[in-house]
Amino acid sequence: MNKFIVFEGIDGCGKTTQAKLVAEKLNANFTFEPTDGKIGKSIREILAGSKCNKETLALLFAADRVEHVSKIEEDLKNAHVVSDRYVYSSIVYQMTQGIPKDFIYKINDYAKIPDLVVLLDVDLNEALKRMESREKEIFEKLEFQKKIKEGYYNLINSENGKFMPKYGFIVIDTTSKPIDQVFNEILNAIVDKIPDIIQ
């Protein structure tokens, strides 16, 4: 049976790079949130600086995820799926903005539960250096990223219900490590949790 694996973490932790490498190794379909659909593109415009009510943005993320889940379920019929961000990003980022957890859970009620979530950790200053070359999104400020990092740890230490992945969470620290070392650590951790994932 094909597996659904999600990569999470603060901006600049190396999620996208590692998610793509793992997807390639597993012959999986790589996907991401926000998606590149119409709603996802609207979200990216807002993150780049357009004005939007925080609850409206939360609803847009949830609407984008409805379409994403449909695609994920279709893709899982033929291959593993690896996603760069998923519902956990919404929970952590939106709770950090002061949106109630109950509201976030309710609007994401249909979200498919992943088999495994890989949380990549990184020193905040190193993350900022990695992001220097990018255009800054509204969420990429140091103090905010610090709260996001805390939010992820609070989530994985308390989530034992609705969005608990089948094989749980794994945490990998990427600080001061080369890409290939991080990749090997992630792959070993995934295989340890799901031994039959590599055929």
UniProtKB/Swiss-Prot annotation:
Annotated EC: 2.7.4.9
GO terms classed as biological process: dTDP biosynthetic process; dTTP biosynthetic process; dUDP biosynthetic process
Annotated signal sequence range: none
The keyword Manganese appears for this protein: no
Keywords, ordered alphabetically: ATP-binding, Kinase, Nucleotide biosynthesis, Nucleotide-binding, Transferase
Gene3D superfamilies hit by this protein: P-loop containing nucleotide triphosphate hydrolases
Entry GO terms, CC: cytoplasm
Binding positions (ATP): G9, I10, D11, G12, C13, G14, K15, T16
Pfam families: Thymidylate_kin (PF02223)
CDD domains membership: TMPK (cd01672)
GO molecular function, one term: ATP binding
Reactions listed under catalytic activity: dTMP + ATP = dTDP + ADP
Family listed: Belongs to the thymidylate kinase family.
PANTHER family documented for this protein: THYMIDYLATE KINASE, UMP-CMP KINASE 2, MITOCHONDRIAL
Protein name from the UniProt record: Probable thymidylate kinase
Species in which this protein is naturally found: Methanococcus maripaludis (strain DSM 14266 / JCM 13030 / NBRC 101832 / S2 / LL)
